[in-house]
Amino acid sequence: MEDIVIVAAARTAVGKFGGSLAKTAAPELGAAVIKNLLERTKLSADQVGEVILGQVLTAGSGQNPARQTTIKSGLAKETPALTINAVCGSGLKAVMLAAQSIAYGDSEIVIAGGQENMSASPHVLLGSRDGQRMGDWKMIDSMIVDGLWDVYNQYHMGITAENVAKAHGITREMQDALALASQQKAAAAQDAGKFVDEIVPFSIAQKKGDPIVFSADEFINRKSNAEALAGLRPAFDKAGGVTAGNASGINDGAAAVMVMTAKKAAALGLTPLGRIASFATSGLDPAMMGMGPVPASQKALARAGWKAQDLDLLEINEAFAAQACAVNNAMGWDTSKVNVNGGAIAIGHPIGASGCRILVTLLHEMQRRNAKKGIASLCIGGGMGVALTIER
C-alpha cells in the first residue's frame, strides 16, 4: 500500500458552553476550517474528492451536516460528504475512513475531521407526535442522551469514570493533580503562542458594531489551583472523586485535516506533516469505557511495529482525569510526553471534533519538536477506543 499522509491540519479555537460559538451552527465552524485547509495547500475547491466529518449531536441540524459543511465551504457540489457518529472518537475515525478511502482508490484527496456545537443541541419532547393525554410530560436533553449517557447501564459518562477510578486505584488527589497540570500546560502553551498556527480565526457577526474574531481557546481556566480543585464537590457519586474541575468540558468547535498519498503530495508540491503509520479501533465493557485508549493504542502500536517507549509525543484525550490517569498507568508510557500543551480538561471536548482536534495539535507540536513518532487516542462512550499513529 502507498504511504498515506496528512498535508494540512487546522481547527477553530474551542468555545465554552454557551460561549462565543454558541449561536454558530456546527457546519459553519467546519466550513471555516475547510476553507483554511484550501488556503494552506493552495488547492482549488474542485480538487477535493470527498469530505468525512464526525458530528455526534445532530438533532435538528438538518440533513447530513458534513454535506452542509461541504457546500458552505465552497467545495464543488460534486464532492460527496459523509457524517459519522463514533461519539468522542468521531473526528479521528473520520481520518481513518479517509485513509481507507484513499487506499482503495475511492478518492485521491479527502478532508476529514469533526465539528460540534454542544451549546446548540436541543431539548426534545419524545412522543409529541401522538400527544400525552394524562400525567407529566418530560423533555429530554439531547446533548446528554445522545452524547454523554451510557445507554447500556443507564447512567452518565461520569459514572464510568468513577468505575475506572475504583478499579484502578485512582484517588481524588491523583485526578486533581492531572487536571491542574492540564490547565497549567494549556495556559502556558496559549501564552507562548503555540496554538496560533493550528487555529483558524473565526469571525462572529454582532448585532451592532464590527464582527468579533474568535481565535483563542476560551475554556482554559487560568484561576485553577490545587485548593480550588480540592474544594469542589463530587459530581456523580458523593463518595467519588470526579468533579467539574477534573472532567473535560462541554464545548463547541471544529477540526480537520487534508489526507492524500505521499505520491500525490509530491506531485502537488506539498510537504507532509506526517505519515499515517497505523490506526485501530477497539471495544470493551461500556461501564469501563474510559480505558478504551489502552486496547486501541496497543493494536495501533503493534500494527506500526512500535512500542509505547518509541513514542516521542502523545495526545491522549482527557475525557476525565480518572481515566486519563488509569490509561497512563496501564500503558506505561512517558507521561512527560503526554498532552504537553494541555488536554481536554483545559482546552475542552467538543465531542464530534475532539478526535481530530488532538490530531491537529499533535501534528503541529511534532513539527515544532521535530518529533518522529506520535500517537493520538481517545476513549469512546459506549465502550470503545480509537488510536492513530503518525510518523515523520
Predicted regions and their residues:
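Conserved catalytic cysteine-centered active-site region
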Residues: 55-109, 152-156, 223-249, 330-357, ...
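N-terminal extracellular/periplasmic Venus flytrap/periplasmic-binding protein-like
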Residues: 11-12, 22-32, 40, 174-267, ...
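Beta-strand segments within the central parallel beta-sheet cores of soluble alpha/beta enzyme folds
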Residues: 46-54, 80-85, 110-115, 174-181, ...
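Conserved active-site "lid/cap" helical segment
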Residues: 1-61, 65-73, 80, 160-172, ...
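Active-site pocket-lining segment
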Residues: 159-162, 195-198, 206-207, 277-346
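Condensing-enzyme catalytic core mediating Claisen C-C bond formation in acyl metabolism
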Residues: 1-24, 36, 226-291, 295, ...
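Active-site-proximal alpha-helical scaffold in enzymes
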Residues: 84-116, 159, 165-194, 256-263, ...
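Flexible glycine-/small-residue-enriched beta->alpha junction loops
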Residues: 109-163
